[in-house]
Amino acid sequence: MIGTRQYIVADHLFLVKADETILACMTNYEPFFTDKADITDALFALTVMQGAPVSYIEEWSQDEEGQETICGHTEDGSPVFEYRFGGKTAGWLVCTPGYRDGTLHLSGFQSKSALDNSLMIQFAMASACMGTVLFHAAVVSLDGRGYMFLGKSGTGKSTHARLWLENIPGTELMNDDNPAVRVKPDGTAVVYGTPWSGKTPCYRNVSAPLGGIVLLSQAPYNKIVPLKGIGAYAAVVPSISGKRWDSRIADGLHETENALASNIPVWHLDCLPDTDAANLCKDTIAL
């Protein structure tokens, strides 16, 4: 039986239409479920079905720890994303040019991973021109404000967040891997928990004003410095998901990235994975 579910993430509504067996697997989305929204206001809709391979022209690919995402387009220009795990395809996402509608064709292998990836991609692309970005980051809250930790994979974002949780009373984990940030018209920003997290399952429907952004680097010492202008912008951009060779999306991302770099405190923390690093960071940024 086919069903439709509505979810709200970062104040954006989206719809998922799929077989009930697929919908039953979406437990990480339950905190974001709603049945009271006006579906005409939906940011996007995704239809999930079993399907045959999709023919497309490849544009770009990314392989991270055996999880490969290949991006391209069909002959008529529709965006396509293929997901491979260990070299085996899990599914193909085909979207309309504005990403408002998408269809995920499942192969029957790693279906939940293909679904999660599709919803992340469609969310990031469809919201890019609405002041919203999806970060690769860990985020904690303290005293009503959110603090994001950025860095390359393996830098220790989750470790630094854990050190805050263990050593700074009142700290809560908002998301471990993929928080969303939305910039308001007045330049302020709000960070949100999402249904997408990393090795730590943290699927919380929470939000907080964004109090600061910290770029982490491993070092044999602890030192934190503020970043301004181009330095702040360069620290923020690599952690934001987006299809930057699409000019419409790139322009939307740039506007949001510039607003964040200009209006939100950004810091660079060289650090050890220790308590002193967490305390130094907190004492500097959480004023």
Protein language model features and the residues they cover:
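Conserved glycine(s) of the Walker
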Residues: G156
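A noncatalytic interaction/capping subdomain that flanks phosphate/NTP-handling catalytic cores
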Residues: M1-M148, S153, L163-E172, A180-L287
